[in-house]
Amino acid sequence: MKKAGLLFLVMIVIAVVAAGIGYWKLTGEESDTLRKIVLEQCLPNQQENQNPSPCAEVKPNAGYVVLKDRHGPLQYLLMPTYRINGTESPLLTDPSTPNFFWLAWQARDFMSQKYGQPVPDRAVSLAINSRTGRTQNHFHIHISCIRPDVREQLDNNLANISSRWLPLPGGLRGHEYLARRVTESELVQRSPFMMLAEEVPEAREHMGSYGLAMVRQSDNSFVLLATQRNLLTLNRASAEEIQDHQCEILR
């Protein structure tokens, strides 16, 4: 019993330290780097010179930009042209807010352009990290390759993923995930953030604790993946963990 109690105490300490590290990352000066790039470089350059640089694309009327990330040969980021911190923002459950996940899916074409040939949809994944799982305080969806092992696991669970949010058997990367199948028409009409907030009990009150990802399945449907922060299991809800920015799946 004493050993069990000690182990539990150690886990608590580790969780607190992990939370502290996450908070430290978010309070450093570099946590505003992406926001400054969008608001002070990409947007003004597009408006004044019709040049999106350093972004790959700037769409002021649609409310988003696409930026080549410095990590990985094919990774891009989709970000709003205005201030949204992350998954905790109530703007994401406002129907008037752009459907950023759908826009990010359209932006996957930048991967193919960079690669020099079409990148199969099955190799693409989208991910946004939770408040404690991110290092930047400007909303950004990672557009990148999926890890081959995650791709295989999702393929094997194709029949187990329904149109309701249910636990994904075995989880992913050692963490628990909820999975939900959506059609393309559903995705066009309704943001995954709204699906999560409206369909998962108590999710709306804790949106900042969730990381969210999206992958296309072999039947042309999409699967949404949501993981919630759980510091006792060292899960910071960094949905980006399903991605491989080196794109081994293309080799």
Curated annotation (Swiss-Prot):
Its main location: membrane. The keyword Transmembrane applies. The chain crosses the membrane at residues 4-24. It is a single-pass membrane protein. It comes from the Bacteria. Keywords: Cell inner membrane, Cell membrane, Hydrolase, Lipid biosynthesis, Lipid metabolism, Membrane, Phospholipid biosynthesis, Phospholipid metabolism, Transmembrane, Transmembrane helix. Signal peptide: none annotated. It catalyses: a CDP-1,2-diacyl-sn-glycerol + H2O = a 1,2-diacyl-sn-glycero-3-phosphate + CMP + 2 H(+). This is CDP-diacylglycerol pyrophosphatase. It comes from Escherichia coli O127:H6 (strain E2348/69 / EPEC). The gene is cdh.
